[in-house]
């Protein structure tokens, strides 16, 4: 990489790759008289701290357990009183648990009060406890805390809860992130004193007046100061807020220093990386080594490093070998490139693989390994997300962190599943790599394919590059496992039992707390009675025993849990305990439900169901707010303490992602919730939206409605975008979904995102498709939204301090905002095939931006977008006008401006490429576009897509200037880059392949035969690519254009085959291609088109020359009376008039003028330009001079229009009546050698019915009909203009007087469909 490119790459690459960051969770410790301070910090300071954390890949959340909110109510049931009693007795234990969970972060607020404490100085002894229920509240707390990991509390039993928390956080551990704030004035005590009478039952007067308490708090402050901890003194709330902000913003800065964060960046991929790292770390904490795990480790490592030995030290991109591997992929010998680790659910596959990945990466840091754990997040199960993640990681790792990956997020091809798979195949061919995909039985298909196809791996090629190793894990009974076992390249490793009894005990002990591990011996005899327990069962039971003993007899629970046969039954028992020990239900009058739903109920049930129904998970504060909206308020309120007790019991199985959202850690728990609590048989993520409305799924539909109403009122865009449209879809609320995606506020936010991720774009396209299927016109809704934006017609908003995302006003919208939003909507409509609507919006945006001189950068974006749209639908002269406008605007910016603006550089690349494809040679020379392109090409090496585009642009411009040899090199470099970006089946790759195949015949030299062979191979690959593109195209007119283009390629391939040695096999192959081309032209251009006439004439000449006996029987029936009678069918067919798609005054003119220069570059030998074909004496065969059926000069002019149509299968040209045919121009040198160039026809207006057709090269075509030498006649026919659908040419046979058409061929014509009847 050049210094200029390196400098530019550093400036451009503002998006850092986020690393795994632990959240900042300070524990808030204070006495009861600090409610006002806590409220102020929670509302004013902590949200600001969370904002700066969120931009650095983490979050800030203060843990504030407000025990004062926990009160008993006279309406409590007996079970609720039991819950209340258990909760009060674990006050100290739960607080210390959360102090440990929050370590090393701690905030202490101290004043003049100390808190409740035991006044008796007599030490409290556990051995003296005979009746737990007879103990006082304070002693119960000491007993529970001492029995659950905190025996040290018995050494100082006379401390208050506040001092116990401070001792645990500060004096038993060391940390630099602990801050104390001492209140120096008693003014804030007034509120507390005024409420003293109302709180007599809870706060006695002795609490404040006791001299012993004052002395204790004084000593505590002295100890804190004496330890050297940071202490701040404040007088009022504002001063406290400033101190807390200053201290904790400095903590954030120290832990996670500020990097160059670009605004409005979609960090979806970076966060996904964090989730998988977090999953590995969690599995490492509970992993237990055994003989079985060591054996499996060895198998996995041997498999992973096999065939990689020679490449372990290679750290650079092996582009050449990668491309070779792509080309060889179908001919590779069968090798074991996939390892499948299978086993029963719960046997420990995920934990084992996660630990092996960590172990392998530490042993072999130079080997490229990318792990992916399905289910590590709620949205990680979709197959499109999985493949996209692998591609992103492979490209980053293979090409360095500075590589810009915008091409994946910009290219519409990645929205098509089959094309994304091709990108994946290209990515794994870059260099040796090991991919790990755990839990494949949980894969689903939401956006690309069906869930069944995602699971059966039929999308994966039958063979992979030998240097790519794919390690998968699955449940033995799954569809994925059965499908993969049938593949010859899969090695099966069955994970059997966990090992001996000691291993089982170690797994059980690993999931116990340190205090419980000391009493583990009491559980051993019970566990020995169940020798076949899986690791998952052991983990579930062990983690459950830590908390259930506070509420019930732990050994009775253990026996009950061990009796169940399956994991599903075990979860049902545990869910039942959670509901009984932590939950309560609402009375019918308090609930928001219209009807009573049978089955388990209560807030714990509701929380689990909400988590299961959510699209991407829910945060703790969101769940508590949801419970409040569902009726859990007042004395039914779920307080922070109730929530803390529940989370402490479920922390192992309901975990937090790095962004703070909760999710189910194991699929078995999700399945149990779906089956037992929701009552559904189909997994929620795979269910149909319409099914939610059935009475059987009324509960599921209810929770979708609850979440939909909740997120309609939320203020954080990404959370709204993640959840709200999903629940609208699942609820069948089509009107609301349509209003959401066309809402100006939503559009405004998305349009600000500089590089939307695949996930963000997939959602928009997915919801469009869903609405379209439901019969909603989304494009019309977008146009109405634009009309409101332009007219500034916005609803009057209610006066509230905060507005939801959907209520945000655009009343103060600027001209730049309007232009940005309209351009975004226009681009999206164009992507979805709404060309007419997109054109109107682009033109409207240009008019708007022209009125604002300061909006030059956005204006050139609009002008370039308009030009590309016109180029796509064939209106090249109009498109050129806008490209020239954009070029003029770009000249206002200096090279320095381009270096510091990524968007400007991208626009420069696009405009130069579009000019090269549409502008005349004079314009390009006068404006020195080639010199500009050469300079700009140095600065885009960091963006592979733009780099390839510039190579292509340079090649076209060099070809226009006559340097064909150097142009060919540029095209080959472009092909190399596009191959390793997109694979071998992308239409962009096909285009450059076809271009090179055409160009080869201008540069035939000593290796003429090998070049012909390469060109033929290129043509065959292009045909496959175009056939594939046709299958994914949804627009009828797009398929028509693809079919016509395919017809041309078939003719070119046939022409090259016939220009060879005329062996029987090559001739028959050429004839088959001609017949395919004939069928396509008859279907799409009409049976009266002149090119059909010419192809039939060529086929008859081939038949006559080869003889009837060698002609395929299937073809003879078309000509029962010989070639003359058959040809009479087309005698009086009129010429079909087409409209133009391209200007004749383009670079093609320059290339036609320089054709002789190309010949000189090719060779100076006179034999190559002889007007006579080469003849091999005695062989009876003649080798024709090279025939270029579709020239390289013309190919680049259709690059933009064809590629954009091909790239987006959804796009529909705006005017269906306008076809875009191509005319053929014959090029004849001074020696009479026939060369063909296919040139697009020109027209000033696509709408006019009469196109002005301008011939670039007007030399008359000499076509003597040689009866004595049939092969010479065929070579002339192959070189004719009618071989392509030329609008200006009408085939006229040399010999007049052909007989009338036969009745058989007349019937064939009558049955042909009129292509214009669409």
Curated annotation (Swiss-Prot):
PANTHER family: DDB1- AND CUL4-ASSOCIATED FACTOR 12-RELATED, DUF4062 DOMAIN-CONTAINING PROTEIN. Its main location: cytoplasm. The gene is Ttc41. Disulfide bonds: none annotated. The keyword Repeat applies. Residues 1295-1318 are annotated as: Disordered. It comes from the Eukaryota. Keywords: Cytoplasm, Repeat, TPR repeat. Transmembrane segments: none annotated. Highly expressed in lung and myeloid leukemia cell line (at protein level). Isoform 4: expressed in heart (at protein level). Residues 1302-1318 have a biased composition (Basic and acidic residues). TPR repeats lie at residues 401-434, 653-686, 819-852, 860-893, 993-1029, 1047-1084. This is Tetratricopeptide repeat protein 41. One of its GO terms (cellular component) is cytoplasm. It is found in: Cytoplasm.
């Amino acid at each position: 990489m050049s210094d200029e490119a390196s400098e530019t790459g550093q400036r451009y690459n503002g998006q850092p790759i986020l690393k795994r960051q632990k959240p900042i969770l300070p524990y808030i410790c204070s006495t009861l008289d600090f409610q006002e301070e806590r409220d102020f910090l929670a509302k004013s300071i902590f949200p600001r701290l969370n904002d700066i954390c969120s931009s650095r890949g983490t979050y800030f959340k203060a843990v504030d357990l407000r025990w004062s909110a926990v009160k008993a109510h006279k309406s409590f049931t007996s079970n609720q009183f039991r819950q209340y009693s258990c909760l009060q007795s674990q006050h100290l234990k739960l607080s210390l648990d959360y102090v440990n969970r929050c370590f090393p972060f701690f905030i202490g607020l101290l004043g003049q009060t100390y808190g409740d404490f035991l006044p008796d100085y007599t030490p409290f002894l556990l051995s003296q406890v005979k009746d737990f229920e007879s103990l006082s509240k304070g002693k119960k707390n000491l007993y529970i805390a001492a029995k659950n990991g905190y025996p040290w509390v018995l050494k100082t039993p006379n401390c208050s809860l506040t001092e116990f928390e401070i001792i645990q956080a500060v004096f038993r551990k060391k940390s630099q992130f602990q801050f104390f704030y001492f209140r120096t004035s008693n003014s804030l005590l007034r509120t507390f004193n005024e409420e003293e009478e109302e709180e007599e039952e809870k706060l006695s007067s002795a609490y404040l007046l006791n001299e012993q308490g004052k002395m204790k708090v004084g000593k505590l402050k002295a100890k804190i100061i004496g330890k050297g901890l940071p202490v701040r003194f404040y007088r009022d709330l504002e001063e406290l807020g400033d101190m807390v902000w200053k201290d904790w913003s400095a903590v954030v800065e120290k832990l996670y220093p500020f990097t160059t964060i670009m605004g409005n960046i979609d960090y979806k991929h970076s966060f996904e990386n964090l989730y998988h790292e977090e999953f590995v770390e969690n599995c490492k904490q509970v992993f237990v080594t055994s003989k079985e795990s060591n054996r499996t480790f060895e198998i996995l490592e041997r498999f992973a490093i096999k065939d990689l030995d020679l490449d372990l030290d290679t750290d650079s991109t092996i582009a050449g070998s990668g491309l070779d591997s792509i080309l060889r992929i179908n001919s590779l010998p069968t090798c074991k490139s996939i390892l499948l680790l299978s086993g029963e659910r719960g046997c420990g596959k995920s934990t084992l693989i996660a630990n092996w990945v960590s172990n392998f990466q530490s042993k072999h840091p130079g080997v490229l390994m990318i792990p992916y754990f399905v289910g590590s997040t709620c949205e990680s199960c979709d197959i499109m997300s999985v493949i996209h993640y692998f591609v992103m990681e492979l490209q980053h790792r293979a090409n360095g962190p500075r590589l810009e990956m915008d091409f994946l997020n910009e290219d519409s091809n990645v929205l098509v599943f089959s094309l994304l798979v091709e990108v994946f195949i290209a990515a794994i061919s870059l260099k040796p790599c090991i991919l790990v995909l755990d839990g494949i039985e949980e894969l689903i298909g939401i956006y690309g394919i069906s869930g069944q196809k995602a699971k059966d791996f039929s999308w994966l090629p039958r063979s992979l590059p030998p240097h790519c190793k794919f390690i998968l894990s699955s449940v033995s009974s799954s569809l994925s496992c059965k499908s993969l076992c049938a593949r010859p390249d899969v090695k099966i490793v069955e994970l059997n039992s966990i090992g001996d009894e000691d291993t089982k005990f170690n797994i059980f002990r690993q999931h116990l707390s340190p205090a419980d591990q000391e009493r583990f011996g009491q559980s051993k005899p019970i566990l020995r009675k169940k020798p076949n327990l899986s690791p998952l069962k052991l983990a579930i039971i062990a983690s459950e025993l830590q908390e259930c003993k506070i509420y019930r007899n732990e050994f009775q629970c253990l026996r009950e849990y061990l009796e169940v046969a399956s994991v599903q039954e075990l979860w049902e028992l545990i869910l039942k305990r959670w509901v009984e020990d932590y939950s309560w239900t609402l009375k019918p009058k308090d609930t928001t439900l219209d009807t009573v739903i049978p089955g388990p109920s209560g807030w714990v049930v509701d929380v689990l169901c909400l988590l299961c129904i959510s699209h991407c998970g829910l945060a703790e504060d969101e769940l508590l707010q949801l419970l409040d909206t569902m009726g859990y308020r007042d004395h039914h309120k779920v307080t922070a303490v109730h929530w803390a007790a529940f989370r402490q019991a479920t922390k192992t199985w309901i975990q937090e992602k790095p962004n703070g959202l909760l999710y189910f850690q194991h699929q078995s728990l999700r399945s149990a919730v779906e089956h037992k609590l929701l009552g559904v048989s189909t997994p929620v993520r795979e269910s149909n939206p319409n099914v939610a409305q059935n009475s059987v799924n009324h509960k599921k539909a209810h929770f979708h409605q609850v979440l939909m109403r909740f997120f309609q009122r939320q203020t954080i865009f990404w959370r709204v975008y993640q959840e709200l449209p999903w629940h609208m879809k699942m609820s069948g609320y089509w009107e609301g979904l349509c209003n959401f995606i066309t809402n100006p506020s939503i559009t405004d936010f998305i349009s600000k995102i500089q590089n939307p991720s695949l996930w963000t774009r997939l959602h928009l396209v997915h919801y469009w498709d869903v609405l379209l299927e439901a019969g909603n016109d989304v494009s019309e809704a977008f146009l109405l939204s634009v009309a409101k934006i332009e007219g500034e017609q916005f609803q009057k908003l209610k006066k509230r301090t905060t507005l939801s995302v959907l209520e945000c006003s655009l009343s103060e919208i600027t001209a730049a905002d309007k232009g940005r939003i309209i351009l975004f909507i226009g681009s999206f409509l164009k992507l979805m095939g709404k060309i007419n609507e997109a054109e109107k919006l682009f033109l409207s945006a240009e008019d708007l931006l022209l009125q604002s001189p300061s909006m030059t950068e956005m204006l050139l974006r609009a002008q370039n977008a308009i030009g590309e749209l016109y180029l796509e639908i064939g209106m090249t002269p109009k498109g050129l006008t806008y490209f020239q406008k954009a070029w003029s605007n770009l000249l206002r910016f200096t090279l320095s401006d381009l270096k510091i603006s990524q968007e400007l550089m991208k626009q420069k690349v696009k405009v130069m490429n579009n000019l090269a494809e549409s502008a005349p040679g004079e314009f390009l020379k006068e404006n020195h576009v080639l010199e500009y392109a050469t300079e700009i090409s140095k600065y885009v090496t960091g963006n592979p897509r733009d780099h390839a585009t510039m190579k292509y642009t340079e090649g076209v411009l060099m070809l226009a200037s006559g340097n064909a040899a150097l142009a060919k090199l540029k095209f080959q470099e472009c092909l190399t880059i596009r191959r390793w970006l997109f694979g071998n089946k992308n239409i962009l790759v096909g285009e450059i392949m076809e271009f090179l195949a055409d160009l080869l015949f201008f540069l035939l030299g000593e290796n003429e035969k090998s070049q012909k062979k390469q060109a033929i191979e290129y043509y065959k690959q292009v045909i496959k690519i175009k056939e594939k593109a046709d299958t994914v195209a949804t627009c009828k007119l797009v398929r028509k254009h693809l079919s016509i283009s395919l017809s041309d390629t078939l003719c070119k391939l046939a022409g090259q085959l016939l220009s060879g040695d005329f062996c029987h096999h090559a001739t028959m192959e050429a004839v088959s291609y001609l017949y395919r081309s004939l069928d396509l032209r008859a279907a799409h251009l009409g049976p009266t088109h002149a090119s059909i006439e010419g192809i039939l004439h060529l086929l008859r000449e081939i038949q006559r020359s080869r003889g009837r006996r060698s002609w395929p029987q299937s073809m003879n029936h078309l000509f029962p009376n010989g070639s003359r009678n058959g040809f009479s069918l087309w005698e009086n067919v009129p010429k079909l008039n087409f409209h133009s798609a391209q200007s004749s005054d383009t670079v093609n003119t320059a290339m036609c003028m320089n054709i002789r220069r190309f010949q000189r570059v090719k060779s100076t030998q006179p034999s190559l330009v002889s007007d006579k074909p080469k003849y091999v004496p005695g062989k009876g065969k003649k080798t024709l001079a090279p025939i270029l059926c579709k020239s390289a000069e013309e190919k680049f002019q259709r690059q933009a229009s064809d590629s954009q149509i091909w790239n987006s299968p959804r796009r529909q040209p705006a005017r269906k009546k306008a076809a875009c045919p191509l005319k053929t121009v014959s090029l004849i040198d001074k020696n009479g050698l026939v060369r063909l160039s296919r040139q697009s026809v020109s027209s000033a207006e696509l709408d006019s019915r009469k196109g002005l057709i301008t011939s670039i090269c007007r030399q008359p075509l000499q076509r003597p009909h040689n009866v004595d030498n049939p092969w010479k006649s065929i070579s002339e026919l192959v070189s004719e203009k009618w071989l392509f659908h030329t609008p200006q040419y009408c085939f006229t046979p040399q010999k007049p007087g052909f007989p009338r058409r036969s009745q058989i061929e007349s019937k064939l014509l009558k049955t042909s469909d009129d292509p214009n009847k669409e």
